[in-house]
Swiss-Prot record:
Listed InterPro entries: Ribosomal_uL22, Ribosomal_uL22_bac/chlpt-type, Ribosomal_uL22_bac/org-type, Ribosomal_uL22_CS, Ribosomal_uL22_sf
Name of the protein: Large ribosomal subunit protein uL22
A GO CC annotation given for this chain: cytosolic large ribosomal subunit
Gene Ontology BP annotations: translation
GO MF entries: rRNA binding; structural constituent of ribosome
Family: Belongs to the universal ribosomal protein uL22 family.
């Protein structure tokens, strides 16, 4: 039995500063919600990672509108994931000649939107 997959528009944000766990905490809350609800939630969440996530979400909706001709008002966040990016390592001078390592983490954000089954 052949099933036709609904079109999915993707957008990626690569090398975003922030840890994967903190970004996933936000993505888990918007997955499965409509585009409008997701934007409202992101606007009022108190997390720093909502800025880059909002940019990637808007890019995914723009891709759906421009490339596939879909209406933004009935789009749903069907896929939202964050993968680990490279870690920048820096050193901080400490007392008595020691140096502590500072890890500046990055992640890759992927968001996909599909039309709502109405």
């Amino acid at each position: 039995m052949a099933t036709t997959a609904s079109p999915q528009a993707l957008a990626h944000g690569r090398f975003v500063r922030g840890s994967v766990s903190k970004v996933r905490r936000v993505l888990d809350q918007i997955r499965g919600r409509s585009y409008r609800d997701a934007l409202i939630m992101l606007e009022f969440m108190p997390y720093r990672s909502t800025g880059p996530i909002t940019k990637v979400l808007r890019s995914a909706v723009a891709n759906a509108e421009h490339n596939m001709g879909l209406d933004p008002s009935n789009l749903v966040v069907s896929m939202a994931s964050a993968d680990m990016g490279p870690t920048m390592k820096r050193y901080r001078p400490r007392a008595q000649g020691r140096a502590y390592q500072i890890k500046k983490q990055t992640c890759h954000i992927s968001i996909g939107v599909t039309p709502q089954d109405a």
